[in-house]
């Protein structure tokens, strides 16, 4: 028997406004009408995902402390948000010109690009994506970089570039300790990678050595960067006030423009003639020291246990696309096991780890209130048939709980950075599949940022076009131009 149900009086996305003459409930921040009835046990199960304003403020305070520790030389070693120096001090001016290569290794995506900067309004890009063999993700580092060089060679030969001397920007979307613009030490693998012989090594050297071993290309890797830095750079090419880059996709991270004098881990932080430095926060590790336990659930801990890096990347596991779908799946299977969904009948597919794709969350939440076309398709793919409306509403409610927490925590992170920069107006370049494809993520993020920021602070959320590709080329371009001025 289904337990008694009751009308929800709170919203996953913000405060509730009741329009009495329609007798409907509307979510603040997204104008999404709430489901009228949800099983109380299901509501209780997802309660831990519902972060209120007080908890969000606490997240901002704790993250502020961690970022300050990451920036300071004396506390950097024990900080969980490392705030690595990117060594990128020059933002695009819009006057960069020429052809540049970019190589983008970002977990689920691997691409080679040729970017031709013709003018600030005319940028030509040619790119090719390559399938990444699963075996390479846990094989040897040499095999990994030989594969990257092979794909780079194939791309260059197919575009008649094999005889051109080209600078390359390498977007490497894993935790890096940069010791120079073209020297980045891998701190740890994430996103399911575990290649041997790479952690603690300069990945630029590993790539350049693989290119040189082939002997068929005239390519010089001049810069390595994180995808967040590329996102910021690409956005700044068109939006001069862009000072923050954010990725919310397979993983999550942010970077921002800090005053050089505050970047104490930069050797020349007190003497550099350049006033600014892009800081790669690596905020995915926020909470690895336990400071986020008050916003984690038993489902988060269950997901963490089956990842290749248990106890690590705590913040990322709460908000990124790699884990959101699995969180939803665990809630569903728990509710089925307790008899609160689908009459206690479970399919083989839903029992498989990672079978509930994060894309399903976007699909389910794309349905209009009272409609279940996408929901039915998702359930069919999971082998769950003949569902009644309360089960479909419950699924949507669970998806909303997980996605709204992700947006709230991202909002906390961005507000922390804006407060740290102490600026009143900023553009934020954003990329990643969660932000791009979730139907309400932008609105949720914007809504909760406004609630947390002090009055008068203006911000703009901008989709950064091909940050990991064009952004890498722009870093290479600024590096080449800066070197030519020496």
Curated annotation (Swiss-Prot):
Pfam families referenced in this protein's UniProt entry, alphabetically: Hexokinase_1, Hexokinase_2
Biochemical pathway: Carbohydrate metabolism; hexose metabolism; Carbohydrate degradation; glycolysis; D-glyceraldehyde 3-phosphate and glycerone phosphate from D-glucose: step 1/4
Region (Glucose-binding): 167-193
GO molecular function: ATP binding; D-glucose binding; fructokinase activity; glucokinase activity; mannokinase activity
This enzyme's EC code(s): 2.7.1.1
EC category name: transferase
UniProt binding sites for ATP: 128
An annotated GO cellular component: cytosol
Region spans: Hexokinase small subdomain: 93-225
Effect of residue 486 to I: In strain: DPF96e3_23.1, SC96e3_12.3, HFL97e3_8, HFL97e3_12, HFL97e3_16 and ZIM(S)e3_24
Name assigned to this protein: Hexokinase type 2
Species in which this protein is naturally found: Drosophila melanogaster (Fruit fly)
Gene of this entry: Hex-t2
């Amino acid at each position: 028997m289904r337990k008694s149900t009751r009308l929800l009086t709170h919203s996953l996305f913000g405060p509730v406004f009741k329009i009495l003459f329609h007798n409907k409930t509307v979510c603040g921040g997204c104008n999404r009408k709430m489901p009228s009835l949800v099983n109380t046990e299901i509501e209780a199960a997802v309660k831990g995902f519902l972060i209120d304003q007080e908890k969000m403020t606490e997240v901002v305070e704790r993250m502020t402390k961690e970022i300050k520790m990451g920036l300071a030389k004396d506390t950097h070693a024990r900080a969980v948000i490392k705030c690595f120096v990117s060594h990128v001090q020059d933002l695009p001016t819009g006057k960069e010109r020429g052809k540049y290569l970019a190589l983008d290794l970002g977990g689920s995506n691997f691409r080679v690009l040729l970017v031709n900067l013709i003018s600030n309004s005319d940028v030509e890009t040619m790119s090719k994506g390559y399938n990444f063999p699963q075996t390479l993700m846990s094989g040897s580092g040499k095999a990994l970089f030989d594969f990257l060089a092979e794909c780079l060679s194939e791309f260059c030969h197919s575009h008649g570039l094999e005889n051109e001397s080209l600078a390359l920007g390498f977007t490497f979307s894993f935790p890096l300790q940069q010791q120079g613009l073209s020297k980045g030490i891998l701190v740890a693998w994430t996103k399911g990678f575990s290649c041997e012989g790479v952690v603690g090594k300069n990945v630029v050297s590993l790539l350049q050595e693989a290119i040189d071993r082939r002997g068929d290309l005239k390519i010089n890797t001049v810069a390595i960067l994180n995808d967040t830095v590329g996102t910021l750079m690409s956005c700044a090419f068109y939006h001069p006030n862009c000072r923050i880059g954010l990725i919310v996709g397979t993983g999550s991270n942010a970077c921002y423009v800090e005053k050089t004098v505050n970047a104490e881990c930069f050797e020349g932080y007190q003497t550099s003639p350049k006033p600014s430095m892009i800081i790669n926060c690596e905020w995915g590790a926020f909470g690895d020291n336990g400071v986020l336990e008050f916003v984690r659930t038993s489902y988060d801990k269950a997901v963490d246990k089956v990842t290749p890096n248990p106890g690590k990347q705590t913040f990322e596991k709460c908000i990124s696309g790699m884990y959101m779908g699995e969180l939803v799946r665990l809630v569903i299977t728990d509710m089925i096991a307790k008899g609160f969904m689908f009459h206690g009948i479970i399919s083989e597919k839903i029992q498989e780890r990672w079978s509930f794709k994060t894309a399903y969350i976007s699909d389910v939440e794309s349905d209009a209130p009272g409609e279940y076309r996408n929901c039915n398709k998702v359930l069919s793919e999971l082998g769950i048939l003949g569902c009644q409306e309360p089960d479909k509403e419950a699924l949507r409610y669970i998806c909303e709980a997980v996605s709204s927490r992700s947006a709230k925590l991202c909002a906390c992170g961005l507000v922390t950075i804006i407060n740290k920069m102490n600026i009143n107006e900023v553009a934020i370049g954003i990329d990643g599949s969660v932000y791009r494809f979730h139907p309400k993520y932008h609105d949720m993020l914007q809504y909760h940022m406004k609630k947390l920021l002090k009055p008068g602070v203006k911000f703009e959320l901008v989709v950064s076009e091909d940050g990991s590709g064009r952004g890498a080329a722009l870093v290479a371009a600024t590096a080449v131009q800066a070197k030519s001025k020496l």
